[in-house]
């Protein structure tokens, strides 16, 4: 899980999701998991 000010899709499997007011990126590749913070 990477915590970043600006979350971006890193590949075509990445999806930007908003959960409880937190922007997250979910992906089939665990290295691509990100959250905004």
Curated annotation (Swiss-Prot):
Alphabetical keyword list: Ribonucleoprotein, Ribosomal protein
Residues spanning the signal sequence: none
Keyword Ribosomal protein: yes
Disulphide-bridged cysteine pairs: none
Pfam families noted in UniProt: Ribosomal_L36
GO molecular function: structural constituent of ribosome
Gene Ontology process terms (BP): translation
InterPro entries named among the record's database cross-references: Ribosomal_bL36, Ribosomal_bL36_sp
Superkingdom field: Bacteria
Record-linked SUPFAM superfamilies: Ribosomal protein L36 (SSF57840)
Transmembrane regions listed in the UniProt entry: none
Cellular component aspect of the GO annotation: cytoplasm; ribonucleoprotein complex; ribosome
PANTHER family according to UniProt: 50S RIBOSOMAL PROTEIN L36, CHLOROPLASTIC, LARGE RIBOSOMAL SUBUNIT PROTEIN BL36C
Family the UniProt entry places it in: Belongs to the bacterial ribosomal protein bL36 family.
Name this protein carries in UniProt: Large ribosomal subunit protein bL36A
Species, as recorded: Haemophilus ducreyi (strain 35000HP / ATCC 700724)
Gene expressing this chain: rpmJ1
């Amino acid at each position: 899980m990477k915590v970043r000010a600006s979350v971006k899709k890193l590949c075509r499997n990445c999806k930007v999701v908003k959960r409880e007011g937190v922007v997250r990126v979910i992906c089939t590749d665990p290295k691509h998991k990100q959250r905004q913070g």
